[in-house]
Amino acid sequence: MDAMPEYSLFLVRILEELDTKYSTVSYQDLCKSLCARFDLVHLAKLRSLLFYTACLDPAFPATLFKDKMRCSVEDQQSKKLMVAADIVTMFNLIQMNGGMAKDKLPMGPRPKFHKNQSFESCRSDTDVYKYNDNDRAYKLLDTRGHHVSRNSPKSDCNSCQQFIPTSDPNFLLGVTKDLKCRAASLDKLQHLPQYASVSPPPCEMQSTYFPMDIDSESTTDQESLHANPGIKDVYVSSGEPFTVHSCVQKRNIFKEDFHNLVAFSPHVITTECRANPKSGGNYHHRRELSKPPTFFNHSFELPYSNPYFEPVNSPLQNKGRVKHESLDDLQASTYFGPTTVSECVSNRRTSSKHGRQPAWPVKSLSLNTEEGPDFERSFLNGKVPKDNHRHNIGTMENDQHFQCAKDKPTASPSGFSKKSNGSKTKDMSSVACGPGIEKREVGRRYKDKSINCPSFQSSNVDNGMSVGTQTEQHESRKVKDYPSQNKFKERPPFKHSEEDSEIVSDNISDIFRFLDDMSVCESLGVVQPSCYNSNGSLSQVTKSDGDSSPERNTIKIGKTGIKLDRLFQSLENSDDELKESVCKLVLRIGEIEKKLESLSGVRGEISQVLSKLTRLDEKIQEPEVNGKSSDGGLVEQIKTDANLSPHVFQCHTTGHNMKVEKSPEWCCSEADGSESLRVKALKKSVFTRRSSRSLNEENSATESKVASITNSPRDWRTVSYSSHNGEEGKERDRHSEGKERHRKSREAERQYEAHQGHRSSKPPKDSYLVEQVFSPHHFPPTVKTHVKGSPLYTDLRLTGHADGKRSQPSWTIEEYKRNSGDKNKLSALDLQVQESLNPNNLEYWMEDIYTPGYDSLLKRKEAEFRRAKACKIGALIFAAACTVILVIVVPICTMKS
């Protein structure tokens, strides 16, 4: 291992080793190479510097590396390997997400270096001589290609690189095969949040640096700055606007406005690329295709990340920063690092220069290892100022060498596309398509897709990535009219390139309209985002009763939104695109209708069930008419009331006319509630009279009920009634007459059936609703007998008695006395029979529904209970026999003997 006179040069050597090998050597081999060539002391120092530099980025996972720094391993070789692995990992992480740290640090303008220019031209004469004496392997050249001598004038370094503090991450990141930089000190800027801004710490807290001479090691940054007069003269003569004089000034620079500092563009414009940009692009393409998949991920690579600045990109010269660019920094920041939007902004400004080579594309930050066209570049090229259309021509000319990867089948960016229902959706790059070839390529890619998937699923859209693509779509359309497309005549002309581009743009508009609608609907609490696609239409309804939910209204809103969007688009588009849009709209409506057909079957089933329930009410009333003449008039009255009831309303679930007399759990409206509840109460009072019948009659009624269900051919949907407002007065009279007649007949029968009159003949609406709510029955009658007798369900048995004894409130003194007297005469069996025969209770309709496993479980528990009971009885008998024998027989025998 070569001995180096400077730590800074030594670290440059290590970083050069990393940069030259990480694209061609695997991760394990790179770690082994570092362990074999460098000492643990230097590796540990570099690891510490990399860690503190990476900590400037808030997206850096510092906790993963912090514990390892404190770890003390006995084996030096394993410790060396661990440190080398951390260096390689952090080096690539910093290369990927170093943009945040670059934005936060104060920087001055730096001139660009070409590939054939050495970093040593900025070195002082003394250092150059030292270096030449120790290591003859490096040829030190100045900017004009001459050898550097001791007596070189200071003006030779005027165009050299300025002073860069090693706290700058560019010092650690910017070293590539051909570009190297040096520094005089290494400040630990991570100590910033630990001290108050009023009383800064002494400079000794920042004494981690690389001295110019190992023998004369200075202790402060001040000494390191002034250790060599040649270096000082270089800084003074260069006219550097930002010169560090003390730690206090270095602290205070962070309180100033960073936006007024000069920005930079992280790419290298070499002499070869400047002379022939196309060849430079081909070189970059060959480099990218030759990258092996063995090392981490290709997303870690930022080729030619340059620490030097371009003064043409200063925000002082261009104040037109968009407000949401700072928001893009936050939205694009992920666990693996931000997407360096500030670099994209500077690239966007420099791309307007005619004939200038654009920036190297930023890699995709996805974890996908496949190569593909750059999403970031297409995103930032999609926003073009209105007054810069002439500059787009040069951008399109220089973009062509990035397109050769798109013609290969392996170049599809699978990180930005998904599959759903067997058909591929549109590429994510179509959301943020830029001008030029990319837009035409995206249009062709869109045209190749099947027409069966015209909508772009909203789950594939990232709101942060789509910023700024909608507002400039008209300007991006105009770009294709320029004659710069003659550059691409080697490709066959597209037949529908214009219409395809507009289709893609319209789809972008649909996405943004969908997002706006979603924000409005979410504030209202109506729409569930997973049910809707980008056109605002229903993608899938998972509920069978979707029509009764608030989504029914949003379906209509979505359909009308589709029609309005298509109508507005048809005013702008050509006839061919209008036809295509109409075809897609018809197909989409057909898909929606097919999805809604499944709901129509559910509607039919519900309507049939309700019609059979209505017929069941009528069938149950027939035995009462034939059996008891005293109830005949009342039943007839109820039937006439039911047939002539004017209260018909539109059912929310089925969309058909429906009587209110059905159970109000299905449909209950405020306007029709009072009349229907009266009729329902009259029906209930009739059903309570059947409690004195035997269980055989109940079984026969059940059989007749089942027969009526199976034999009723009439569809409920064919039943319709007309509403007449003039009959309301007559119906009220009928109700009052029915109540009086029912009260008289009940008074006559009270002496024979005293326990039957416990229910009031005037049930008000409130009490009826209270009974419906507070009298739930969870088990059918076939199971309730087991439940009431089982010791495992004592709580249910108690609540069953409580529910059975709860009756309607009494509104007069007579009813109160009568009900209080009748309650004591009721038995549990009568209550159970009454509840099972009451159609207002759930168990009336759940009578024949049971679970065989539940019955077998109850039978098993009952058998165990009986067995335990028999064992107890046997034990008691045995104990009694033993007691008798011991107490009576034994004394008698002893007395006789």
From Swiss-Prot:
Ranges facing Extracellular side: 894-897
Compositional bias of kind Basic and acidic residues: 472-498, 725-756
Top-level taxon of origin: Eukaryota
Membrane topology: Single-pass type IV membrane protein
A Pfam family per the record: MINAR1_C
Membrane-crossing segments per the record: 873-893
Keywords: Cell membrane, Membrane, Transmembrane, Transmembrane helix
UniProt region (Disordered), positions on chain: 405-433, 450-502, 688-766
Disruption phenotype: Mutant animals show no gross developmental abnormalities. They have enhanced fear-evoked freezing and compromised C-start responses. Mutant brains exhibit up-regulation of mTOR signaling.
Compartments, as annotated in UniProt: Cell membrane
A GO CC annotation given for this chain: plasma membrane
Record topology, Cytoplasmic segments: 1-872
Protein's GO biological process: negative regulation of cell growth; negative regulation of cell population proliferation; negative regulation of neuron projection development; negative regulation of protein ubiquitination; negative regulation of TOR signaling
Bias (Polar residues): 411-423, 452-471, 697-724
Coarse class of the protein's main subcellular location: membrane
InterPro entries attached to this UniProt entry: MINAR1-like, MINAR1-like_C, MINAR1_N
Record's function text: Intrinsically disordered protein which may negatively regulate mTOR signaling pathway by stabilizing the mTOR complex component DEPTOR. Negatively regulates angiogenesis. Negatively regulates cell growth. May play a role in neuronal development.
Family under the similarity heading: Belongs to the MINAR family.
PANTHER family linked: MAJOR INTRINSICALLY DISORDERED NOTCH2-BINDING RECEPTOR 1 (PTHR31530:SF2), MAJOR INTRINSICALLY DISORDERED NOTCH2-BINDING RECEPTOR 1 MINAR1 FAMILY MEMBER (PTHR31530)
Listed name of the protein: Major intrinsically disordered Notch2-binding receptor 1
Gene label: minar1
